[in-house]
Amino acid sequence: MYGGDDYGNNAEYYDEYAHTGDPQLDMEYERNYYASRMPENVKYFLINFCQAIKEGTLYDIQNMYENTFPQISDHHFDKSAWPDEQEVGPIVDNDKVFLILYKELYYRHIHARIPGGPKLDQRINSFFNYCDFFNLIISSQNPVMLELPDIWLWELVDEFVYQFQNFAQYRARLTDKSQDEIQQLCVNHSNVWSILCILNVLHSLVDISNIKKQLEAISQGADPQTVAGDFGKLSFYKMLGYFSLVGLLRVHSLLGDYYQAIKVLEPIEIHKKSAYSHIPACQISTSYYVGFAYMMMRRYADAIRTFSDILLYIQRTKQLYSTRSYQNDQINKQAEQMYHLLAICLVLHPQCIDESIQQVLREKNYHDAMFKMQCGDLDVFKSFFVFACPRFVSPCPPAADAPMEDYVKDPMEHQLMVFMDEVRQQKDLPTTRSYLKLYTTLPLAKLASFIDPNASDDDVSKLLIRLLCFKHKMRNLVWSKGPSGLEGAFKSGSELDFYIDDDMIHIADTKVSHRYGDFFVRKILKFNDLNRKLKKITI
């Protein structure tokens, strides 16, 4: 596997004295043999990495994971795989735990760097390696004493869900596969990367860590350690449980089950900063999928708030992730997607947002596209959605006897159809709103003539349907408080309201002017409270 060479067929590597019959000597021979073919800095990195994981020195593990491993990858393995398990095993005394963790990085590197992506056997082996890891930590009677940095735990869960998504798309593309590959996918390995396996693993991590009970205890001001259990008391299990909740959010979003996507996060107060949200990539990913789910549920006010808050966070914390180029690229792409989704939501549900976000929308020329959407250009809606939506997957793979077609786009086209049906119902509302904002009273017939100069009596009756649609679409469920993101109260999102008496429309501007005095009073009180606390500190 390593380097694409078949070493067994090369006579120059044959050594008749390789095996002596003494296990100790044979192991020493293998260690020296593989080490001699490996760059010295790679060999020493693997030895030190294994030692750091054995000893649980978090600082060293994090430094090697975040800095040394990417640097060696760039220098030695930019377009090729790292050494495989057979080469690494003898160097690290075949340490079982380290080899599982190493293979997680090994297959992740193949997915990210190898041109053409991983082969089928590599995808399958990666799945079974994840199974080995999760069985190790979940099936144990007692907690496994393993220390890994939170960033690795997050990226491990995130990569687990990504490889499921990637495999589902690979499996749905039948046009580039032979009959033998289809046989392997549909018969021999039908359970590999199955949705049931993914959900089972993530829910098991949530359950074993008692993370939901811990989050509920925190929200009630209680000590989470009292409900954490033997496993949940350890940071390793606790953070895996938290990240698994976000993984479940992503999985349900990819399947198009938006209600369940929000439901699974119920212990997490989505709109409040959490003590567990110190990993920027996790916080950004959470907000992206929550905001998208809200948008698809027609809860535009909540979607706008979610996108605005996280985009402000990204603006203010760029320096936290700018040192890791691949993470920077990923976050920048997700931010660009959220600006597209925010533009869609603002067209469908106009409201005020932070001026710095407005400035970005102006600088990146989103306003031109937003104007076209306001004028009913469905193609712009479609292109924005296709660019910004997740890459949906189907929970069921194509059958073994299915026609040899490409089924990858089917889930996305279904979600696009659902979204565009909603847009078509609303595409005329901006025009209606623009006329209503000009008047306090307006006859129905006059409004009908504004919309269509050749309006007939039938058009006036159709106008009533349009006005009813306006009322309905502008009234949305909006979250106000509580741990459940599904809760809320119905509120009108429009800056105007109206009622119809006979043939006359009575319009009221409900826009509330900003009360800056309250804002400054709150800030002054907060500053005074902070000042009192500082004076009490003894140095």
UniProtKB/Swiss-Prot annotation:
InterPro entries associated with the record: eIF3l (IPR019382), PCI_dom (IPR000717), TPR-like_helical_dom_sf (IPR011990)
Segments forming domain PCI: 306-514
Residue stretches spanning the membrane: none
Keyword 4Fe-4S annotated: no
Keywords associated with the record: Cytoplasm, Initiation factor, Protein biosynthesis
SUPFAM superfamilies from the UniProt entry: TPR-like
GO biological process: formation of cytoplasmic translation initiation complex
Family: Belongs to the eIF-3 subunit L family.
Quaternary structure note: Component of the eukaryotic translation initiation factor 3 (eIF-3) complex. The eIF-3 complex interacts with pix.
Its biological purpose: Component of the eukaryotic translation initiation factor 3 (eIF-3) complex, which is involved in protein synthesis of a specialized repertoire of mRNAs and, together with other initiation factors, stimulates binding of mRNA and methionyl-tRNAi to the 40S ribosome. The eIF-3 complex specifically targets and initiates translation of a subset of mRNAs involved in cell proliferation.
PANTHER family referenced in this protein's UniProt entry, alphabetically: EUKARYOTIC TRANSLATION INITIATION FACTOR 3, EUKARYOTIC TRANSLATION INITIATION FACTOR 3 SUBUNIT L
Protein name: Eukaryotic translation initiation factor 3 subunit L
